[in-house]
Amino acid sequence: MGKISNYLEMIEDIKNKTPEKEAFCTGNSSLTYRELFLLVKEKQKKWKTAAKKELYFIQKEQALDQLTEFLTCQGMGYVPVILPKDMEEDKKTALIQKFCAETKVPEEACMAVMTSGTSGENKLLFRTFESWYNYFPIQNEIFHITPESRLFMQGSLAFTGNMNLYMAQLSAGATILSEDRFDPRLWIKD
């Protein structure tokens, strides 16, 4: 594979090297890198490519659904923004209208993250693929993330720290063990 330019291509690269390696586990289900890639490619067939960069808002309950929607946006012209799953509908509608009306999406953006709003209102921060991907080798070395690593995660990908850890883990060809509720007793089973 040539130069990797988005997160789905990153998954494809790992899939080409270790297709049957576990990528994501939650509850009683598990996806290999091949299965994750094929699931996202199947979703992409149902989408139209955006004519220009545009925001795509994701609000899903399960981390796997958040991840697959995020990956589906890659290479399709959409810049995903994962919203907290518990965001009230009226606030969500107002934010989407505001962001769509006031925000020019940078051409090089591959994703946007929403600030927590501690300063009074939520803001969007755009990220390029390279801004995270090029740092993952250093980050993974610091935290000893290898293809054999298994990272236990809990919580929404709307939280930027979780999204970064997911992508760093996947960039190493490692495995994510995800739970939607905080209960370390569940991790013992995985």
What are these regions (language model features)?
Residues K45-D86, M153-S156:
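Conserved AMP-binding/adenylate-forming
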